[in-house]
């Protein structure tokens, strides 16, 4: 079966932004104009098509990335039919992981900003993630009908706060209540969308006389940006002082794909103005799968290999999301990078080293499914019923194995204890937590060794609220929830050598394991590093792995207060063994003993998660807010001017001091200040706090 749409006409894009920038509303309008939904769903009515979980519709935020396939031929039907695969991503900071795994598989992104709030903290996080994966992007400044909306101010913030190079290809006509439409700077025409048919039709008009000078100034900026794409365009521009519409588009496209510029558009999705032009810009300026860098991976021997977006290359795909569907079970969302795969084919999961049979393959429209017989390079689809696939796994051809680069997931910073209310809930809770953990790599489940409690950890209070809520709704599990606890960690600051000797000899076969370890800090964020420097066989090869396992087990149990130990390098340099009595378990225990004794003598410290906090407050309350953050052991890092006489405070504050902050901030500022926070890093706890934590744990 051949392709319906040539791959050059594919666009795999993400729509991402800060909470409340109007991202889901923008996606709803895209679905409406591309003919996929006949009635527009509003977020504030709880009817948005892309927000299909009950919690999303209740809270009016997007939690999971819904994937949708649509088709577009242009506002004037000026293009052949293009296939647009859209991923709508959450904007709340607790769900940053969803954004990360979406950007990993996209070719381009539309970043939505609010016309009045401009660049907000989560926008910076999303922008950094897009930089990391080198995703070409464009900007849609939404909510131009809101009080305080200012397109060019937001463009300036994108330049100063994000370090990007924005090039407006439109200007707004009027703002706030007076917002009427946009000027297309490439055509130098005003676009007026009809309010009678929800913006399905439009007319081109002359640029308003009072905006002619401003439009010409920004058009010159646009043409110069296009001319810088290559020498040919620059020569023509210098000779003639102008470029044709096609040349402008070609130059802007080339520079966007090279991540040199970011094109900026504006509008109001809610008022049905501007989204239509965004769709045209997606086709004109964002890349097809063949225009982005080939994906790199490793073969079985660890050699680097590439896969291109080509149906003739061997099949390779990345599983970027696992979702539990109430009717069909597990859905594995995958991005196909190369080759073709049909339903019924057997593929290889190269990370887990297992074969998987692809039963049914479906293309998603939010939470509606359409079954397809095959998927090809460039496609985003979901497979039903895969057994052992988790997020970040590679699926590939049985005879051409490849591991695409793994995604890195953040360490959870907050945990709560959950207890089932009845014995019946006990069994269901285990199943529910297992499924939810498979869906979300930033959510972990563990059992406390001392109390036997089940602990769940995640990226924030909202994250864990939603997990508990989903257990109740989707799996009918009732549970009691404890107070949030901070996920402390331990590490060492010094270097030491230590001996671990485990001997049990009481008639018959005994146990004997003896090791010497050098214990020192590893590089920050390097995790656990184990080095084997045994020469001459003082510890036989078959026991080396057991020593490493013993060290790792002790690291998980901690040495000071029972918290997992981070960033340690352990070097096994000597030891001895017994021909008969030595065993793996003996060396495992010896490794564990050596690590515990050594770590206690290597200046162990407790680490706590530090949060990057941004508080937006009216100037009158500034002193109160700063004083309160100082009381919470916060370090003020800087201050910026926000919109409408607001100040934006940036600070680093320990997570343990931030519980209940929302309520305190509201009462201190009469509800006029707001804040956001995200994990920054683990930092050493002051001595007095460390002593208190150790006392509470022992």
Curated annotation (Swiss-Prot):
Provide the tr-type G domain boundaries. 8-290
SUPFAM superfamilies, from UniProt? EF-G C-terminal domain-like, P-loop containing nucleoside triphosphate hydrolases, Ribosomal protein S5 domain 2-like, Translation proteins
Give a short account of what the protein does.
Catalyzes the GTP-dependent ribosomal translocation step during translation elongation. During this step, the ribosome changes from the pre-translocational (PRE) to the post-translocational (POST) state as the newly formed A-site-bound peptidyl-tRNA and P-site-bound deacylated tRNA move to the P and E sites, respectively. Catalyzes the coordinated movement of the two tRNA molecules, the mRNA and conformational changes in the ribosome.
- Organism of origin is Photobacterium profundum (strain SS9)
Which Gene Ontology molecular function entries are recorded, alphabetically? GTP binding; GTPase activity; guanosine tetraphosphate binding; translation elongation factor activity
The record, for HAMAP family, names:
EF_G_EF_2_B (MF_00054_B)
UniProt cross-references to PANTHER family, sorted A to Z: RIBOSOME-RELEASING FACTOR 2, MITOCHONDRIAL, TRANSLATION ELONGATION FACTOR G-RELATED
Q: Which residues bind GTP?
A: 17-24, 88-92, 142-145
Main localization is cytoplasm
Cellular compartments per GO CC: cytoplasm
Q: What is the protein name stated in its UniProt record? A: Elongation factor G 1
| Gene Ontology BP terms | ribosome disassembly
List localization entries: Cytoplasm
What keywords does the record list, in alphabetical order?
A: Cytoplasm, Elongation factor, GTP-binding, Nucleotide-binding, Protein biosynthesis
Q: Which family does it belong to?
A: Belongs to the TRAFAC class translation factor GTPase superfamily. Classic translation factor GTPase family. EF-G/EF-2 subfamily.
């Amino acid at each position: 079966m051949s392709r319906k749409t040539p791959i050059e006409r594919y666009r795999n894009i993400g729509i991402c932004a800060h909470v409340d920038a109007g991202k889901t509303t923008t996606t709803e309008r895209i679905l409406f104009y591309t003919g996929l939904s006949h009635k527009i769903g509003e977020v504030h009515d709880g009817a948005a098509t892309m927000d299909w979980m009950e919690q999303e519709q209740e809270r009016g935020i997007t939690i999971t990335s819904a994937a949708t396939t649509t088709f577009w031929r242009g506002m004037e039907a000026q293009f052949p039919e293009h296939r647009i695969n859209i991923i709508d991503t959450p904007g709340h900071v607790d769900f940053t992981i969803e954004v990360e795994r979406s950007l990993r598989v996209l070719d381009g992104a539309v970043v939505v900003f609010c016309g009045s709030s401009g660049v907000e903290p989560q926008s910076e996080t999303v922008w950094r993630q897009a930089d990391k994966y080198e995703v070409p992007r464009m900007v849609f400044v939404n909510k131009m009908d809101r009080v305080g909306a200012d397109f060019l101010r937001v463009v300036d913030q994108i330049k100063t706060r994000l370090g990007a190079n924005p090039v407006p290809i439109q200007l707004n006509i009027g703002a706030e209540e007076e917002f009427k439409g946009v000027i297309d700077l490439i055509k130098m025409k005003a676009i007026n969308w009809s309010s009678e048919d929800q913006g399905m039709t439009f007319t081109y008009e002359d640029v308003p006389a009072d905006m002619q000078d401003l439009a010409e100034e920004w058009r010159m900026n646009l043409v110069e940006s296009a001319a810088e794409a290559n020498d040919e365009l620059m020569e023509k521009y210098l000779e003639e002082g102008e470029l044709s519409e096609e040349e402008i588009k070609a130059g802007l496209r080339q520079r966007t794909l090279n991540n040199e510029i970011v094109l900026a558009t504006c509008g109001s999705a809610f008022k049905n103005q501007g989204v239509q032009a965004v769709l045209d810009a997606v086709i004109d300026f964002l890349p097809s799968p063949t225009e982005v860098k080939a994906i790199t991976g490793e073969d079985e021997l660890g050699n680097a290999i590439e896969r291109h977006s080509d149906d003739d290359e061997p099949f390779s795909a990345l599983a970027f999301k696992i979702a539990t569907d109430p009717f069909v079970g597990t859905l594995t969302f995958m991005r196909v990078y190369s080759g073709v795969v049909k339903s019924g084919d057997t593929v290889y999961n190269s990370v887990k080293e297992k074969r998987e049979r692809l039963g049914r393959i479906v293309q998603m429209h939010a939470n509606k499914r359409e079954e397809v017989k095959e998927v090809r390079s460039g496609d985003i689809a979901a497979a039903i019923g895969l057994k052992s696939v988790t997020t970040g796994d590679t699926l590939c051809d049985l005879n051409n194995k490849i591991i695409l680069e793994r995604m890195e997931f953040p360490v959870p910073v907050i945990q709560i204890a959950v207890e089932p209310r009845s014995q019946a809930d006990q069994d269901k809770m285990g199943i529910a937590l297992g499924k939810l953990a498979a869906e979300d790599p930033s959510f972990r489940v563990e059992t406390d060794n001392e109390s036997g409690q089940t602990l769940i950890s995640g990226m924030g209070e909202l994250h864990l609220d939603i997990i508990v809520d989903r257990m109740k709704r989707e799996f009918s599990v009732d549970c009691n929830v404890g107070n949030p606890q901070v996920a402390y960690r331990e590490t060492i600051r010094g270097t030491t050598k230590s001996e671990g000797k485990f001997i049990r000899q009481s008639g018959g076969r005994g146990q004997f394991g003896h090791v010497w370890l050098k214990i020192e800090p590893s590089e920050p964020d390097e995790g656990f590093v184990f080095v084997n420097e045994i020469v001459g066989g003082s510890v036989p090869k078959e026991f080396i792995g057991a020593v490493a396992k013993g060290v790792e087990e002790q690291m998980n149990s901690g040495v000071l207060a029972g918290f997992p130990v981070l960033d340690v390098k352990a070097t096994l340099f000597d030891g001895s063994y017994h021909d008969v009595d030595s065993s793996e378990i003996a060396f495992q225990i010896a490794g564990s003993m050596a690590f515990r004794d050594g770590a206690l003598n290597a200046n162990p410290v407790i680490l706590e998660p530090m949060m990057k906090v941004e508080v937006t407050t009216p100037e009158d309350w500034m002193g109160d807010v700063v004083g309160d953050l100082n009381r919470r052991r916060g370090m003020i890092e800087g201050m910026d001017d926000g919109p409408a006489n607001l100040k934006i405070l940036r600070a680093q504050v320990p997570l343990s001091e931030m519980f209940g902050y929302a309520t305190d901030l509201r009462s201190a500022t009469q509800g006029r200040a707001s804040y956001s926070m995200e994990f920054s890093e683990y930092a050493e706890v002051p001595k007095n706090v460390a002593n208190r934590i150790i006392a509470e744990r022992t």
